[in-house]
Amino acid sequence: MKVLMLTDSFLPHAGGSREYYYNLYRHLAEFEETRVTIATKKVPGWEEFDRKASSDSFGIVRWLRPLSTWRLQELPKGLGPFLHAAWHVAKDNPAILHAGDLYPQGVSALILKKMTYLPYLAYCHGEEITLTDRYKYQPHMRNRVYQGADAVIANAEFARQSLLRIGIPESRIVKITPGVDLERFSPRPAREELVDKWNLKGKKVVLTVARLIPRKGHDLVLRAIARLTRELPDAVYLIVGRGPEEQRLQKLAAELGIMDSVRFAGYVPGELLPDCYNLCDVFAMPNREEANGDIEGFGMVFLEANATGKPVIGGRSGGTADAIIEGKTGFRVDASQLDELTERLRMLLTDTNLRRQLGNEGRDRVQREFQWRDRARKLHDVSMEICKARSREKRTAILANPE
């Protein structure tokens, strides 16, 4: 089975969906007689990443290449990726297309299906629906892409319910939540050089690993820390990541008078992220839905933190109900209620036994339920069934019209 995956959401560009696709397709390609090609765009750092990924079992092709005397990037948005996809369909003759993004990849898959009868499955992380609901014409094209798909992969229950709401048949929705690399994310002693670098010795550390954008809720944690510092003077907030909100968050920390209790770590290489989780006492990302409909589709960071034995706090919006079991692996809070977040942080920072209990349960749950190989098997089986069904349809058509 040849699989051609079309997506703009792929490493080395940072983000949960990029990690989701990388791990899912890395394991999918390990199945016998399954060949996977990722068709994606060039982003900063792609050459080094592709060299390192050359040992993986899938291929990566990047668009924005010269074509005759002009370049694909000079074409209107959407046409370049479509031509790139069409060229690889003609060249490689895949059995199925996977569309990782609604636009332009999902639209490209829909058009190619009409042109070539090639089946496709599409992905939904939830925000594809919440972000387009507010527009006049986008919901129509969105619905055509999902209705035309042979299957739609929902990454969480929130996404599955959103698909049902817009009329996608339940029989065509397959829920495949993210997994965790348990060899990479595991409990280990704190790395002393990082403890010294960020002056964390003897501190109670609250950690967020995320892009610095509004829906992640960094500002809420800052305000909660400001409330707690008098009672818990050793509490420190470690922020790992970069983003457009960095200056605003630094300004807020200064206004709250807590700069000494905040560490802006900036970009941290992926190989050091497990060590960052192991530095903290509590992982907190009180995500919220933005006015434009932007939401947290799942929250892979909650699983990564649990995998290292840490309790987590997340927001109640989006798909976090799949990532956090309330009172078992952590807590979900109403991000509009600062009192609730503050109290949950106080509870965890002052109760060692509770932290250990939730962290251990989180680790056990991740080991039981969130193996990447299991998710890849589900994707493999869905894809194979679609390909077999299409083959049966073709044989039936040939028998019905022998001439």
Model-derived regions, located:
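N-terminal subdomain of nucleotide-sugar transferases
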Residues: 1-50, 401-403
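Conserved donor-binding/catalytic core segment of Leloir-type glycosyltransferases
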Residues: 4, 200-216, 222-225
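Carbohydrate-associated surface elements
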Residues: 42, 158, 179
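Nucleotide-activated donor-binding/catalytic signature segment of Leloir-type glycosyltransferases, i.e.
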Residues: 250-271
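Conserved acidic donor-binding segment of nucleotide-sugar-dependent glycosyltransferases
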Residues: 325-327, 331-338, 347-353
